[in-house]
From Swiss-Prot:
One of its GO terms (molecular function) is GTPase activity. A lipid is attached at C181 (S-geranylgeranyl cysteine). Gene3D superfamilies: P-loop containing nucleotide triphosphate hydrolases (3.40.50.300). This is Ras-related protein Rap-1b. GTP binds at residues 10-18, 57-61, 116-119, 147-149. The modification ADP-ribosylserine is found at S39. Residues 25-67 are annotated as: Interaction with KRIT1. Its main location: membrane. The modification Cysteine methyl ester is found at C181.
Amino acid sequence: MREYKLVVLGSGGVGKSALTVQFVQGIFVEKYDPTIEDSYRKQVEVDAQQCMLEILDTAGTEQFTAMRDLYMKNGQGFALVYSITAQSTFNDLQDLREQILRVKDTDDVPMILVGNKCDLEDERVVGKEQGQNLARQWSNCAFLESSAKSKINVNEIFYDLVRQINRKTPVPGKARKKSSCQLL
């Protein structure tokens, strides 16, 4: 079974842990408890393929930024999360993306831009178009709006990253099955 190392990044309070826990355990975490680092594992089926996802839920606070290079070096796919209710969290993502590209030393990194808390439409300050435009600027990066509370697009975030990783590095063994050996 193929393993995938996914990393959830973004400012403090955007809902990184809420999205991760909702995906892994099906629970909405109501209380905000700043994360230092949590790792979760979940087996899922994506496109008829069994996958083991290792999801690293990272700290959003500035005091743990030294650990980020290590997450970025080891991660295969990245969810960059902002809150649609806080413009500053959206603005912070440009630097995070640049750091990922610098650490990975390539522009071709599986990544998805996530506007979280879309259930709080009354409090929205970051328009959906802003997210779509930024994703386009980022070499047509994938983009979704989500809500951990309302279970909107939660699974899709992680499945999309798996699909991007599969496109970038096809599943070992699949290519071999296509070729055949003929003995005469």
